[in-house]
Each structure stands twice: as structure tokens, then as C-alpha cells.
Amino acid sequence: MVANGHFAGSADGQDSSSYEHGVQVIDEDKEFNPNVSKYLTYENVTPAGFNYHLISVFGSQSTGKSTLLNNLFGTHFSVMSETERRQTTKGIWLSKNKRLELRKDRDPQAKMADNILVMDVEGTDGRERGEDQDFERKSALFALATSEVLIVNIWEHQVGLYQGANMGLLKTVFEVNLELFLKDNKSTPRSLLFFVIRDFLGTTPLQNLQNTLLQDLNRIWSSLSKPAGLENSTINDYFDFAFAGLPHKNFQPDKFMDEVQKLSTRFCEGHRDPSSLDRKGTGSIEGGIFLPEYHRRIPADGFAVYAEGVWDQIVNNKDLDLPTQQELLAQFRCDEISREALVAFDEAISPFESKQAEAVQAGTPEVLGGLGPAMRNARMKAVKNFDTEACRYHKRVYQMKKTELQDKIDTRLKALFLGQLNAAHRSGVQEFSESVSAAVKAGQKKGASYDFAEIVRRQRKLAIEKFEKEARSTLVEDAPWSNYQQELSLYQKDLERTSGQLRRDEMRRLATRVERWVRSRLGESVDLEFNALGSGRGGSGAPEFGDKPSEKTIWDRVWTLFVDTVLDAERRFTERASSFDAGLDEVDVGLWRLRRKSWGVLRAKIDEEMMEGNLLLKLRENFEDKFRYDDAGVPRIWRPTDDIESVYSQARESTLTLIPLLARFKLAETNAPPPLDKWIGHTPSSATPADEEDLTPIGGVDDDEGKSLEEEMTLIGEAKKQDLTVRFKKTADGVYVEAKRSAIGGITQVPLYFYGLLFALGWNEILAVLRNPVYFLLLFVCAIGAYITYQLNLWGPIIKMTEAASHQAVEEGKRRLREFLEASDTGRQAMAMSGARNATEEHEMSRLSRKPAERGGRKNRADEDVDDDDDDF
């Protein structure tokens, strides 16, 4: 029979199905299984943190330990065959509790603790190991270092025996307990020894069996060699005990299962009854058997590593020293009195602490009403109750414990006090900010100017008065922490910072409004300048007011408009900022940002005008105005005798000069870029990174940009200039060709002798028309119609309409003829004969070889290529 063969052993593979029933932690050769962490992950225990419990079971071999665990926790540990007596469990095995929910018809409220892990330890006193007790001692030490509860499985008839009742095993447990936990005397982690008495008949009361076992345990404890200072310690200082009896599984199966069901209800979280606590802090356990003091405080995700390290030290016979903390027994009474004094204190203060914690967790600190009187009364009563009970003890211990009690109380009260001031601080700052914003909005709605600085001063005074009133009401007399001057100073500084932030926000909004105004003004002004650039007419074609401005000074005019607009904006900004109580540094930063932002607005507008489509349109308009209109702004009507080439050349060359002019932002007066770097100025020393993060880098101004002022003022690159020149010339050539055609279009090349011949041969017809009033009137009407058609330039549309009508008439005639032939017998016969001839010709053509066809195809393609070349030409 394979021991626990359906579990994941240390040599098993990585298949998750092998973890379904558990895992072997340590095999019979004392090797630790590295797959324990995978099993915990498989059972979803790893993310549980401290929310898990570990139980180990001890007992003699073949006493039904695995059977007990399987029935109690729904596990699947292998059990011994009823037909033979031999070792079943080898090493240490681990499985998670599978019985999560109790039967709700028994106890609807009962529920076992989450993530209960059960370790089945190899039985003792087995013939397989014989006299070798090394593994027995090592497994006991391992279980005690990791487990909260140690279940001792014994039979009723073994009670009172030494070996049969596992007293040798328990002595080992006590010895390793001293070895494990007494090296660090700061604390004493407790463990629970849970005796499960099997085959319990009830003849001997369970209480009597319990007394017998406790007497044996105390006798074993007394026989142990204890460290110095702990000679008088008792077993109850380190262990709690619990007892349960189970009927015979085979003779009373139903009753056995009922008692197992009842027993399972005890495996949940419990607590000690406060009324039964003794001087050592122990007492009866209520609820479940899992107490916080039993837990080893090892997170679930690190348990496998922790257990492996513990076993490595144990198996290599190294000293196992676990960090613990313990209070001295001499201080228990004072600690008990202190706890009793804190009970009433907790009742008064805990509600305020809970409310404050909930408010902090929700992110909305709340000023608690009535906190000051409650703190003063609770502190006074707690100290008085402690003095009454503890003043009879040793003065030094009494004073030390009183100081500790006061420190505990003051620590909690100080936390409440600081939390109250923090809530008053945060709510006060928030109310201050909201009040200032509301007052500013009210002033804006009225449409009148408001004094921002006066609003801030008034609201700041009200906020400080409210904070001081709340702080005074929370003070506790005689408390060393009862001083709020530091918090008041921090509050005032925070109000000052908030005031500065509100002022900066208001100045940002002011700057945004001014920037919008600058954008609107610059947009209109620059549009007018570039629109004037598109008109090359003079005389009556000049602007409505004044003469047409010179094209060469366009950048001078744009720069002047820009500087004047920004100066006006700076004046508006400075006047409005004076009411904000802003310092000179803040105003300087605002003006500096305004100049940079304004340049960005101008540059964006210029880039928009310099877009290829817009620029080509303006160049064409400029050229056409110079070519189609004379100096007086009168449209030109071209005649064959006009010098079109000269006018074209002058207009084209004049327009071409605009491309290099517009390529760079350069003043005509100085023949250099405008002094942008001097105009913007250096970065103010008070400017913060937040003031610069939304600014666009400017070449020649920002050293980090890597661009010079010349590059910043370059609007069109060389490649784009050449492309614009070529495209403009093509456009101008088209206008020139159109003008040339219009000039020569009216010339008729008719020989003079044709008119004499026409007059001689048509004399009779002329006389007939002149003598006949009808013909004469018809001729007169036709002449009038032809003249009107010519003046309205309708000859072209009339000719096109005539051609379209004639084409439609031909198509309609073909359709009618086809319908006639299809309707008559003669026509159908003729169409059939024509179809037969076509089929014969197609059959004969299909018999031709591919080579002539290919030659013909190449010839046809060559002909098509020639036709295409002719069309292109």
C-alpha cells in the first residue's frame, strides 16, 4: 500500500491535478518538498495574508489520526487497511480544509474559519522506525514552530498510561517548546493542545479524563529542566488545553458523525472571556479555538519559504531562534488594572476615533462636535481609576505603569486632537478657497470691478478666527501636547499659499482673457495686411482710404501692429493685476508670458497666411491685378496691337519679388529681423517651471531651442521658394495665353476680293430681299438676334446645344429604324444573314496562328503608342 499515494509527493511533477487532495511537505527521508508553494497557490491560500490557520495532529501510529482528519475536515489522507496493521502516513502531509460550510440545519450561523491547513504528522512508536526517535523530535519541533493548534489523538483506554497516552511525545513537545521560544525572553507565543479522546464511552466523565491528563502534563512539565528565571513557570504560561470525546467509529457510526459535526464548529475564530481573565491574561475561550495569540504571524505567501528554512535548521541540528516578544509576569497586575481603566476610556473615545478614521479613509476629514469635553472627561476618569487600584504596589512600577497609561491615553488623545485640527485645517482651507471664488464670481456677475485683494483679506481673517475657536474648544488641560500654535502657524502658511494660488489662478484667467483679445486683434490686423498684399491695383483699385501701401514694408507694418497691440494688452493686464495685490515679480512673469504667448499667436497667424494654397492664391491675385488692370485701376481690353509681352513681363517680375520678400520676417527700415529677443526680454528670476511648461520655445530667445533668430524669422525655405516660383510661373503663363487668345480671336482672315465676288454674284438675291418686305423684316430680325447673341456671348452655348440636339436626333432615328426592322419579316431575315456572316468571319479568324496575331497585336499597340504621342504633342 502506497502511503498517501493520491497526494502530491516531493517527486511529483507539475500537474495541478496532483494537488487536488494535498501535498507531502516532508518525506520519510527528511527531504522538504519544494512544491508546497505551488500547492498553496493551487488552493488559493497564497493571497490570504494572515487569514489562514495551521493545525497539526500527533499520536501513536495506527490510532486513526488520518481517519479523524478526513471526517473532521473533509480531507483525503490515506488510512490504514482494516485487514492489516502497518504504517500508513510517512513524513508530514498537508491538505486544506474541504469542509467549508457546516450543515445549516444544525447551526445556520456557524461557519468554519477560512483557509484551514491541516498537517498529518507521521505516527510515533512505530515498528518501522523502532528506537530511532530523531524524526519524532524534529517533526514535533517543526509542527510547534509553524502550527497554532496541536491535536493529540488518543484512545480512552490509553488515558493514564505513559507511552500509550503519548506522554513521551508530549514531553518532546514541551522540551522543544522551551528550546524554541525561550531563547528570546521578550514574549511567549502560546499554542493550544487539543486532546481528542477516541472511542469515548462516557462511563468515565470527560472532566475526570481531562483532570488525569492535566495532572500527567503538569508532572511532565515539572520534571523538565528549565532556564534560569523560569523555574517556577507553569505549563499554563505557554499552553492552553482543550478536550473533546468521540464515540467509537465502527460501533456507533451515526453518533460518531454527529459528534464530529459538533466538533468541527469549534474550528473558527474565538476570544477570551473578559470576565474570566486572570492575572496572566488567560481565561476561558469563547467562540472558536483560534485565538490571535496562537498565530505565528507568517504571511501565507511566505509560509513555504519560512517552513523550508525552519526545517533546514532543524534537520541540520542548528539552533532555532525565532523572534518573539513577551511581557514580564511581575507587570501583569498593573497591566490588568491599566486595561480595566482603558475600558471606560475606550467606550468614550472609540466612537470619535472610528468617525475620524472613517472620514480620513473616505478622504473627507470631518470636524467632530463635542470632542473636547469628551476627551477631557475620559482622560480624567481613566487616570483616577488607575490611581485607586495600583497605588498600593511598588512605587517605581506604579509610577512607570502610570506613565505608560498616560502615554497611551495622551497618544490617542493627541492623535484625535491633531486629527481634529487637521480636519479644521483642511475644511478651513477649502471653505476659504470656495468663499473667495464665490465672492469673485459674484463680482463678475455684477459686471463691476471687484477688489480681489480685499476679498482675500476678509475671508482669511474669518478662516483664522474659526480655526482658533475650534482649537481652543479641543484643548486638554495639563496635557503636554495641548498647544496649537504650531498648527496655527502651518494653517496660516497654508492659507497664504492658497491665497497665492488663487491669485495666480486669477492672473492666469486674466492672462487668458488678454491673450484672446490679442488673438482677435492680431487676426483682424494681419488679415487686412495680407489681403492688401493680394491686390496690385492702383488708382480706383487702391484701398478705400488712402493710397495702396508699399509691398516692401509689409513686415514693418505687421511688426508695428503687433507691438502696439501687445503694449495695449500689457497696459490692460497691469491695470487689472494691481487689484489682485500681486507682487512685482508676479506681474513681471505675467507680462513676460503675455509677450511670448502673443508672439506665438502672431507666428501661427503668419504660418496660416504662408500656407502654400493661400500664398499661391495671393500671388495670382497680385499678378492678375497688375496684368489685367492699368495704373488707374481700369480693366485692360487686349487688342492685337497691344504690347502684351511687356505688360506680362513687368507684372510677373513684380509679383515674383514678393516670394523672397515673404520668405523672411525682415524689416525694410533696418534690413534685419525685428529685435524679438530684446522685445521679449530675459526670463524673470521668479518664474517657476510651471510658468514655462506650456510655453512654445522661440528661436533666438531660448538657448535650449537650438535655433537662431534668423531661423525663427525664416518663413519659407529655399526648396519651397523654388517650388512656389515654378508653380506661379505656370499660373502666370496660363493667364498670358488666355489674354493672347482674346486679342487675336477677333481677327478674321477673309480676302478682300471675296467681298466683291460675293456682292456681284448675290446682287439679284440682295434686290429680292430688299424689295420683299417679308424677307427684309426677317433679315432685320435675324440681324438683331445675332447681334444680341454676340453681345451676350451665347454663340458657344448655342452651337453646343445644336450639336447635342443633332446627335440625339441621329440616335433616336437609329433606334426607330432598329424597331421597324425587328417588327417586319424582311428585316429579321436580313439581320439573321448578317449574323451568319459575322460568325463565319469569326471562325476563320480563330484559325489564324498566334504569331501573326502577336505581330498584329504589336503593330496595333505601336499604332496606339503613336496616336498617344500625337495627342500629347
Swiss-Prot record:
Start and end residues of each stretch annotated as Disordered: 1-21, 676-703, 828-873
Species classification: Eukaryota, Fungi, Dikarya, Ascomycota, Pezizomycotina
Role of this protein: Cooperates with the reticulon proteins and tubule-shaping DP1 family proteins to generate and maintain the structure of the tubular endoplasmic reticulum network. Has GTPase activity, which is required for its function in ER organization.
Any one biological process term the GO annotation gives: endoplasmic reticulum membrane fusion
GO molecular function: GTP binding; GTPase activity
InterPro entries: G_GB1_RHD3_dom, P-loop_NTPase, RHD3/Sey1, Sey1/RHD3-like_3HB
Residue ranges annotated as Cytoplasmic topological domain: 1-749, 795-873
Enzyme class of the recorded protein, top EC level: hydrolase
Chain intervals with Basic and acidic residues compositional bias: 839-863
Name of this protein: Protein SEY1
Enzyme nomenclature, EC number: 3.6.5.-
Membrane topology: Multi-pass membrane protein
Binding site for GTP: G59, S60, Q61, S62, T63, G64, K65, S66
Family as reported in the entry's similarity comment: Belongs to the TRAFAC class dynamin-like GTPase superfamily. GB1/RHD3 GTPase family. RHD3 subfamily.
